[in-house]
Amino acid sequence: MIPEPAIVVCTTNARCLDVLKASVKAYVPRNIRTYYFHGVGATFGEAYNHAARIAFKEHDQIVICNDDIVFTPTTWRTLLADVALLKEAVADLGYVAARSDYARGAQNIRSGTGRLDFLRFESERSIIETPVIAPICAWIHRDAWVDFPPINWFSDDVQCADMKRRHFISRAYVHHVGSQTCGNDAAKCMADAEPWLKANRPALHAVHFGRV
């Protein structure tokens, strides 16, 4: 097995891919292998299940990346430093995900807490545990991996719960354009996911749709 983590990217329209590639080239060590998959699977989950299976044949660990993110000069170094710390402290480690400016909950830098210090919230200096992360740019080990469900919205919730692992938000940051895969029609995204959730995860369905 190759000891270094691989970067795994799935893309549909590839509108932002050139910028991601440029930032990877500029800020990620040259020995890190990157896998790009275009037009695989009908959903986000199906695409990344396919991509992870291929990458895990040669790597014990991968970093899942959306195609519409941009690395900073410190993203890779900080993310892997936090992974190393957590490996020592957490036996059942799941995802370790970068923060961004377009993410849910505490993973979004706008949700920071504490005083502002050089335009960053104090909380951005800390690793934070959370039950669900969005793998916009997220490290995961093959031993923790379980497949995504065949849906777009709420696939993160399902996968993170099915892993039965502890997930963390890193101090690392990536810029995220957002809504390039599923689009901006929230009502449609909700409606597309509802039948699968109702049939397979009724408790989660009740949380988001208010009925079983």
Regions of interest found by a model, annotated:
Residues G94-S111:
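Short beta-strand-to-loop element that shapes/binds the nucleotide-sugar donor at the catalytic cleft/hinge
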